[in-house]
Regions:
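Active-site helix-to-loop segments that bind/position phosphate- or nucleotide-bearing substrates
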Residues: 1-32
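Internal, well-folded beta-alpha domain core
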Residues: 30-184, 189-196
């Protein structure tokens, strides 16, 4: 029923950046973006989708619900992960190179599986922000905070037109601050000390 409705004319089409409604996109809050913000996003932001592959923010899509481990019998029983991997990796690498050769990776680990990630990391510079909180005297990753922080950082990048990973260190939100001692050139660690 869901898949039949997907092609129905009544199913609304929206720009990808406005179509998604999860925690990351709520914190990103593109509804208040200016035309300039959308223009910068269109050039510098890419969204990953099990249904559509690699999207630019203004690509028009229909709402859908789909998991990456769906098997495609018509295509030799491969999953969506393997289907997209061979189709997206080259395009993704070229996109990153044409935008300066540096990727700020704010995608979930699951979405990285849409690409040959080892190849991506070997051909372009990948910087991955991590978000941790102190809990019971240890650093912990709390999924909801990670998702919210990814959305907020994406907003920070787009609103401030950030192009240099060094500028990401200035990100601060809800107690999350950059921690130089836990970071390196591949990962930028942000810590919230609320549970110390």
């Amino acid at each position: 029923k869901r898949y039949q409705a997907f092609h129905a004319e009544a199913t609304p089409e929206l720009p990808a950046l406005l179509a998604y409604t999860g925690i990351v996109f709520k914190r990103l809050n593109p509804k208040d973006f200016s035309a300039e913000d959308f223009g910068y996003a269109q050039e510098h932001l890419r969204l990953t989708s099990f249904c559509y592959g690699l999207l630019r923010p203004l690509d028009v899509i229909r709402a859908y619900r789909l998991e990456g481990d769906v098997v495609l019998p018509e295509l030799g029983n491969q999953t969506l992960f393997s289907y997209w991997r061979s189709r997206l990796t080259d395009t993704f690498i070229e996109d990153i190179r044409s935008a300066g050769g540096i990727l700020c990776n704010l995608a979930s680990d699951e979405m990285k599986s849409l690409f040959d990630w080892k190849r991506v990391e070997s051909e372009v510079r990948v910087v991955t922000p991590e978000f941790h909180v102190w809990k019971n005297g240890k650093l912990a990753t709390i999924v909801v905070y990670t998702k919210m922080s990814r959305g907020e950082m994406t907003r920070f990048i787009l609103k401030n037109k950030i192009g240099n990973p060094e500028e990401l260190k200035g990100f601060s939100w809800e107690g999350f601050e950059f921690d130089e001692s836990l970071s390196d050139e591949k990962k930028l660690v942000f810590i919230n000390g609320m549970g110390e």
